[in-house]
Regions:
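A generic structural signal for short beta-strands and their flanking turns/coil linkers
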Residues: 96-98, 126
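Short, conserved, surface-exposed binding loops centered on an aromatic residue
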Residues: 90-95, 119-122, 131-132
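Conserved short histidine dyad/triad with adjacent acidic residue
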Residues: 101-122
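A short beta-strand-loop-beta hairpin characteristic of the jelly-roll/cupin
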Residues: 112, 131-148
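Generic structural motif
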Residues: 11-15, 105-108, 133-135
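Non-heme Fe(II)/2-oxoglutarate
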Residues: 1-93
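Short, conserved beta-strand element in jelly-roll/cupin
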Residues: 104, 122-138
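Long, contiguous binding/interaction regions
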Residues: 61, 100, 136
Length: 148
């Protein structure tokens, strides 16, 4: 299967409505992480405004929240292209998947190259990372090679 052949289109209005519904129901599951960084406007540090929320999406519950994130610019929240609607599509595409974690990076966000935790190898699980680009300036590195 070629990931490029998969159709992960989503209606952003529906995704944001879905996210707002989940935020209202599941707010008790969120833990806000305030991490002052020099380039952050200090007036924003203690505002619990979300830019990046990971959802642990399983076949049993497509709305189980996890993770802790902050917003470095509240204006970004409304513009963020939430990927929540892709969860069911991904799980239905990979029939053996037990869960999917979807994460949206803020503008100029960066994921540091890493190897996922050791327990995963022991459980005979294989993690598949699918980068979803929301604009033509986004890119990723695969095996040290820049891809768009």
């Amino acid at each position: 299967m070629n990931v490029k052949d998969l159709d992960f289109t989503i209606d952003l209005n529906e995704a944001q409505a879905w996210a707002k519904e989940v935020l209202q129901v599941k707010t008790s599951l969120f833990r806000w992480l305030y991490d002052p960084v020099p380039y952050i406007d200090s007036s924003l540090i203690f505002q619990p405004v979300l830019y990046n929320l990971q959802y642990n999406i399983t076949k049993e519950d497509f709305r189980e929240a996890c993770g802790r994130y902050i917003d470095r610019n509240p204006k970004n929240y409304a513009r963020t292209n939430f990927a929540f609607g892709w969860g069911e599509v991904i799980l239905n595409t990979f029939s053996d998947a037990c869960n999917a974690i979807l994460s949206v990076l803020p503008p100029k966000g960066q994921v540091i190259e890493h190897i996922d935790g050791k327990p995963i190898a022991k459980e005979n699980l294989h993690m598949i990372h699918i980068p979803i680009f929301s604009n033509d300036k986004a890119f990723s590195y695969v095996n040290g090679e820049k891809v768009f």
